[in-house]
Amino acid sequence: MAETDPKTVQDLTSVVQTLLQQMQDKFQTMSDQIIGRIDDMSSRIDDLEKNIADLMTQAGVEELEGENKIPATQKS
């Protein structure tokens, strides 16, 4: 290879740095979106758990014992 022009090296370095910064920004944006969606999903799951517990209470189902659901009317 012939001599490398310092200006060309500086230009290439600048382009690579810009590209890396753009990639980092995109990854950060995606990461923030994913975390936001996970937080939203967590809230929805909490709401679902509460709704299920409320429905079980309304249906007369008490706490689960082991893996079997025992309705309040069948408990001894």
UniProtKB/Swiss-Prot annotation:
Its main location: nucleus. Signal peptide: none annotated. Keywords: Nucleus. It comes from the Eukaryota. One of its GO terms (cellular component) is cytosol. It holds the Pfam family HSBP1. It is found in: Nucleus. One of its GO terms (molecular function) is transcription corepressor activity. InterPro entries: HS1-bd. GO terms for biological process: axonal transport of mitochondrion; cellular heat acclimation. Negative regulator of the heat shock response. Negatively affects HSF1 DNA-binding activity. May have a role in the suppression of the activation of the stress response during the aging process. Belongs to the HSBP1 family. Homohexamer. Associates with heptad repeats of HSF1 trimers and probably also HSF1 monomers, and with HSP70. Association with HSF1 trimers and HSP70 coincides with attenuation of heat shock response and the conversion of HSF1 trimer to monomer. This is Heat shock factor-binding protein 1. It comes from Pongo abelii (Sumatran orangutan). The lineage of its organism: Eukaryota, Metazoa, Chordata, Craniata, Vertebrata.
